[in-house]
Amino acid sequence: MSAAVYKNQAYLLGGIDKQTIGANCQIYNLDNNWSEPTQYSLPGGRFGAVSFVYRDSLYVLGGSDGSNNMNEILRYDLSSQDGYGSWDVIAEFPAHQRGGIVLVVGNKVYAGLGEGGNGIRSGFWESSDSLKIWNPISIPDKIGSVSSGVYDEQRNSFFMIDNNGKIWEYNLSSGEWTARSLLGYRMNNYHMFMLNGIIYILGQDLYYANKFIMYNPIWDN
């Protein structure tokens, strides 16, 4: 399941359970209400995609249909007055991937670092405007596949954690990567969010207890 936020509403798309690969869209608002409007349903079921909002449109990138990883970029215009639009394939991403990250800063979209074929980590790219042209960003040889990342506005950096439990910083001003802390455990999935300058990391695993930690970039120099 992937998620994105637009005008105080969270959009949750696709996902998988034991039997079904989902195509539905669930919407959560600040009144603590859930809805599932059918007009937002995806053209086909997918899981492991990433979603984001860019210029009043909702996007879904990549994911898997259960047989193959995808590279489609789907767009739904959220600015429609009546709320009824459609999903359109607007571009192809440079890699077929599942997982990975998408981060929007200003007019640019940064995406990639998901899991490609045979579990190999995909690259990292940036784009803008129509999202049809993606420019590659060099990445460290040792970085693994990434499932979550955050933007630190004060440092103008992305912080992300790979599937080895390694935290990485990518500074947008200098274009430099810095290897940060290595967590003392590996988990199947990581989720990150940032609040008041502190990064919170939830590690999830099928066989071990979940881990929840606080990470302050200022400490990690």
Listing of model-derived features with the role each one plays in the protein:
Residues 1-221:
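Kelch-like beta-propeller repeat domains
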